[in-house]
Amino acid sequence: MKRIVNTDDAPAAVGAYSQATTNGDLVFTAGQLPLTADGELRDDASVDEQTRQSLENVRAILESEGASMSDVLKTTVFLDDIDDFEEFNEAYGEFFEEEPPARSAVEVGRVPKGAAVEIEAVAVTE
């Protein structure tokens, strides 16, 4: 049965969606922007910093459900400029040093709120 996930440790949704949903032992996060828990985006943040903040938001949501980054099965990454891939990839790799999940990374026209990156994840709790 589907259940809605909401934690104060990650930014609130900026639209008509949930931070995450679960069904059985699967957790599906919404795309996480590089917003602080209070919803702020630093205009001067680098792609590295934005990637880290987005992944910290993913981590906070997963931890609220008893999961961790090592439980992530798949991520989807949206970049507003694919030329930032190397900088993104270096920061991303620090969160998944062993047994990284499957991943898709694509360039999109724009990311909400003027961010450079948005990351969603699917994880399993056991």
What kind of feature is each model-predicted range?
Residues M1-Q53, A60-L73, L79-E126:
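N-terminal presequence-like segments and the immediate start of the first folded domain
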